[in-house]
């Protein structure tokens, strides 16, 4: 079967950026930035994104482009005879399934809130207790949560079943274009609110006092973690898009564009959140409470809040759904390569698997609310811990070692693939950094995540 390919470079960049851009860009990056010295944190973040995130991104893409296959088969095509690197391909796919076990539920929350604002469920005069109660009611109703999760899964696999160009690429182009327009409109509106500039200053102006209080080591560690996790590396989520790429552009050049889009959305998200919260005297927090309690409380007290709430949750829906369909594509491509299934068969069978696997997360907030797993975490946080703290860093380390050691694919073959085409080239002089320093940085992140 002839390997599918992207219709355009723009399609590849927007699909890949859509995979990287997700909920964490909005509910984590702005908060961590504000708490860790503003502009100083952003500077360290950008340094680590270039020094850590971009190299590993090019490695995943290189494995995909050189092999023209999905996770397991890509290792088999490139590894030396008798070696076992392909075992990680199976682990990477497990990571993709596990990520979707909870990400589909959270993406469903975004869709639910878009329709809640559209219907006018959130009205002026509501306070933080009211918006908290509304979110609590959603979590307490397994049928409602399951409905929105099912909507997300069914729509996601419907998109992917239509093929790479007519499904994933076409929908991602539309969603990412709309997302970028929405984020600019929302940020401009937020910045023009009364008292909003104080929020902008807190968010982006370098704050040496905050850095001194927190400690420069902690700021650097936070920046390193954010830069590493933002691209969702380690579970072959990016590798699959490398397998659909052409050879006309270098991987560092294309990877830099993906990083730039991801960073733009993360920084702009803060320009929506901080000015609005400062304008209405609301304390900024992180995670689900920021998105589903704090910000709705801001919107309901804002002139035209129903419209702005709709636009924000449309943006969040696109941000989360772009990740969902990107990972679904990876899961389907794996099934097509490994078992010879058609796209429709891969979509149907994997759709059923993901629906069943997502049930524990849905029930974890109500029927199974007393169930605590890893370190006392609830179901969603336990699944997230497995993916974010174990599979992503370990997977990134495996891709790195595969690409730069003589026991794997090898540094020279990786560099030749990465530098094929026009654009930004990776210097061969970086070999010692890739072989000795970068693995230690990833190992540090892995150990930090377990402490």
Please tell me what each predicted stretch does.
Residues 1-27, 56-61, 65-87, 246-250, ...:
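Membrane-interface "cap" regions at the ends of multi-pass membrane proteins
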Residues 2-6, 169, 173-321, 325, ...:
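Membrane-embedded translocation segments of transport machinery
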Residues 3, 73, 107-140, 242-248, ...:
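Helix-loop-helix connectors at the membrane interface of multi-pass transporters/channels
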Residues 3-4, 32-36, 66-91, 104-165, ...:
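Inter-helical loop and helix-membrane interface segments of multi-pass membrane transporters/permeases
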Residues 5, 11-13, 19, 142, ...:
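Loop-to-transmembrane helix boundary motifs in multi-pass membrane proteins
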Residues 5-16, 41-44, 83-97, 146-152, ...:
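Select transmembrane alpha-helical segments in multipass membrane proteins
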Residues 11-48, 236-242, 253-256, 260-261, ...:
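Transmembrane helix-boundary motif of multi-pass solute transporters/channels
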Residues 87-93, 339-351, 382-442:
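C-terminal membrane-solvent junction of multi-pass transporters and transport-like membrane proteins
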């Amino acid at each position: 079967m002839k390997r599918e390919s992207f219709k355009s470079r723009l399609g590849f960049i927007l699909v890949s950026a859509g995979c990287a851009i997700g909920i964490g860009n909005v509910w984590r990056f702005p908060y961590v930035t504000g708490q860790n010295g503003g502009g100083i944190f952003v500077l360290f973040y950008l340094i680590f994104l270039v020094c850590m995130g971009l190299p590993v991104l090019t490695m995943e893409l290189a494995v995909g482009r050189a092999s023209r296959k999905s996770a397991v088969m890509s290792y088999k095509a490139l590894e030396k005879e008798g070696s076992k690197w392909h075992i990680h391909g199976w682990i990477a796919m497990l990571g993709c399934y596990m990520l979707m076990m909870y990400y589909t539920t959270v993406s469903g929350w975004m869709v639910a809130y878009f329709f809640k604002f559209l219907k006018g469920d959130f009205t002026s005069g509501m306070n933080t207790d009211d918006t908290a109660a509304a979110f609590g009611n959603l979590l307490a109703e397994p049928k409602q949560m399951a409905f929105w999760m099912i909507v997300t899964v069914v729509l996601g696999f419907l998109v992917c079943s239509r093929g790479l160009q007519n499904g994933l690429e076409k929908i991602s182009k539309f969603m990412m274009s709309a997302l970028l327009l929405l984020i600019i409109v929302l940020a401009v509106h937020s910045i023009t609110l009364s008292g909003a500039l104080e929020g902008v200053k807190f968010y982006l102006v370098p704050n040496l006092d905050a850095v001194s209080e927190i400690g420069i080591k902690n700021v650097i560690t936070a920046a390193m973690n954010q830069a590493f996790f933002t691209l969702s590396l380690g579970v072959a989520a990016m590798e699959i898009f490398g397998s659909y790429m052409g050879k006309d552009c270098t991987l560092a050049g294309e990877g830099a564009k993906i990083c730039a889009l991801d960073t733009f959305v993360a920084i702009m998200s803060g320009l929506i959140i901080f000015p609005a919260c400062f304008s209405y005297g609301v304390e900024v927090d992180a995670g689900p409470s920021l998105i589903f309690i704090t910000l709705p409380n801001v919107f309901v007290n804002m002139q035209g809040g129903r419209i702005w709430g709709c636009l924000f949750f449309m943006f969040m829906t696109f941000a989360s759904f772009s990740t969902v369909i990107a990972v679904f594509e990876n899961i389907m491509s794996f099934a097509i390569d490994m078992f010879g299934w058609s796209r429709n068969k891969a979509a149907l069978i994997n759709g059923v698997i993901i629906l069943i696997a997502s049930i524990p997360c849905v029930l974890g907030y109500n029927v199974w609310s007393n169930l605590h797993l890893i370190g006392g975490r609830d179901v969603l946080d336990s699944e997230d811990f497995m993916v974010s703290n174990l599979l992503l860093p370990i997977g990134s380390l495996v891709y790195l070692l595969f690409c730069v050691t003589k026991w794997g694919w090898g540094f020279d073959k990786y560099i030749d693939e990465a530098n094929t085409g026009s654009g930004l080239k990776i210097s061969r002089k970086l070999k010692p950094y890739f072989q000795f320093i970068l693995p230690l940085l990833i190992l540090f992140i892995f150990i930090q995540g377990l402490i």
